[in-house]
Amino acid sequence: MAAPMLRWGCRGRRWAFARVDGGSCHRRGAPTGSTSNQIRGESSVAQQPLHTAQKTRKGEHKWAAVVGLEIHAQISSNSKLFSGSQVRFSAPPNSLVSFFDASLPGTLPVLNRRCVEAAVMTGLALNCHINKKSLFDRKHYFYADLPAGYQITQQRLPIAVNGSLIYGVCAGKKQSQVIPKTVRIKQIQLEQDSGKSLHDNLRSQTLIDLNRAGVGLLEVVLEPDMSCGEEAATAVRELQLILQALGTSQANMAEGQLRVDANISVHHPGEPLGVRTEVKNLNSIRFLAKAIDYEIQRQINELENGGEILNETRSFHHKLGCTMSMRDKEGKQDYRFMPEPNLPPLVLYDATSLPAGADPQQVINIDQIRETLPELPSVTREKLVQQYGMLLEHSFTLLNEVGLLEFFQNVIKETRAEPKKVTSWVLNTFLGYLKQQNLAVSESPVTPSALAELLDLLDSRTISSSAAKQVFEELWKREGKTPGQIVSEKQLELMQDQGALEQLCHSVMEAHPQVVMDVKNRNPRAINKLIGLVRKATQSRADPVMIKEILEKKLSL
């Protein structure tokens, strides 16, 4: 039976940032031996009582979890890394394969300039040092969807090294505090993608599609500075937003444009690092968090029961919610790395090293690319907070949901309502409806202009808040009516006749003398009860602000 999930302190999952309670994920985890030999701070993990064959008592020691990531992002380019074949998702099988992609003898690689520029741009955005000279290598292994028997990558000297990624972790019971956390980036390297193996169980066949073979990849190696699934998922989501903002990768995990391998180990604080396992090909942020948390708990259970952790590769079964062994790595695989003989060193320049009279089309200028960097998500969040006075966690949510920031900005442009009111309606009402029906922003039946018109009606006190929600429900039905038409048809306008409201308030006061007495006796709830009675008599069409003013005047408050 699968081991129970570990109860982490950072349980409340949000797309934009992780929740951390009790400090269990506030400290950095120690790195595994896979990507760094430095010892960092450790994060303790709450332990559940387990049966064990060891002599130590249960709960005597805490556990520290260590998580590192290898992220493969498919570069947004018209052609592949070393050939002129097109890159297009869902093309017919083997319809985008050049002679080089199929590894026919005599074919040679030609480096794609766009892929190099994308790697430099990504490295700069992630605070990396860009190597002016980088090298290509062959990584040998046999698999059916790798026709050459090797992959061209950058093992010795990658294009970018020593960067950092800052992401936000939301802490506290009300999620009101965003704590910045940093994960180091070991390197970014250019490499080829492999083809796809398609398994036909009905015919007991494995079919090969080479359309993806040779597509340019950015491999981003994150040092093991994370300590739970939520931290890893949040870091990957932030990287995804950065890649999309840069335009260097669409980073659509559903289409395999962003794939993650997680290296995970556990140990007692102050003791040597544990044996790590690698969970491969995680293609969803939600599954990434689940797989890491499960694997951490599985390792703890195994060690508490007197077992040992194998250095192995595992996969995540999303239906069962557990990791499963694929192959062990005890006999370390020899990839026989060697320099790529058909590619010279990749040489880049900056403003100081650029040769005089160099053709801009023949060289890549690092400083020139730096000047073209677009606004990054962190800067956008700061602007949202400063310009609209919203909470930082709200800015995370706006950026995190695809298309939501653009929707919000379009509403802001078309309405007179205050930004805080727009923020509340977009993040609470609008986003809530989307989540209930599992819709993307682009699939919403409510347009920015319709919501803007509704907020204008509310802001001008033409309708009440309850009526506005009723109008929104009608808009969601896709009947093609405007908010103004709905208000008119259902007679939802607030009563503006001062004389009629005064008469109505007088009638309610006469009908409820005890409530009037309570108001005069300074009962704070009594005035609200009177307001409610008046609004009930008008089917909620009376403006509560006007009612309160009239009642206070009549009662001499």
UniProtKB/Swiss-Prot annotation:
It catalyses: L-glutamyl-tRNA(Gln) + L-glutamine + ATP + H2O = L-glutaminyl-tRNA(Gln) + L-glutamate + ADP + phosphate + H(+). GO terms for cellular component: glutamyl-tRNA(Gln) amidotransferase complex; mitochondrion. Its EC number is 6.3.5.-. Belongs to the GatB/GatE family. GatB subfamily. Residues 26-45 are annotated as: Disordered. Residues 32-45 have a biased composition (Polar residues). Keywords: ATP-binding, Ligase, Mitochondrion, Nucleotide-binding, Primary mitochondrial disease, Protein biosynthesis, Transit peptide. Predominantly expressed in tissues characterized by high rates of oxidative phosphorylation (OxPhos), including muscle and heart. Transmembrane segments: none annotated. It comes from Homo sapiens (Human). Allows the formation of correctly charged Gln-tRNA(Gln) through the transamidation of misacylated Glu-tRNA(Gln) in the mitochondria. The reaction takes place in the presence of glutamine and ATP through an activated gamma-phospho-Glu-tRNA(Gln). SMART domains: GatB_Yqey (SM00845). Subunit of the heterotrimeric GatCAB amidotransferase (AdT) complex, composed of A (QRSL1), B (GATB) and C (GATC) subunits. HAMAP family: GatB. This is Glutamyl-tRNA(Gln) amidotransferase subunit B, mitochondrial. PROSITE patterns: GATB. Residues 1-41 form a transit peptide. GO terms for molecular function: ATP binding; glutaminyl-tRNA synthase (glutamine-hydrolyzing) activity.
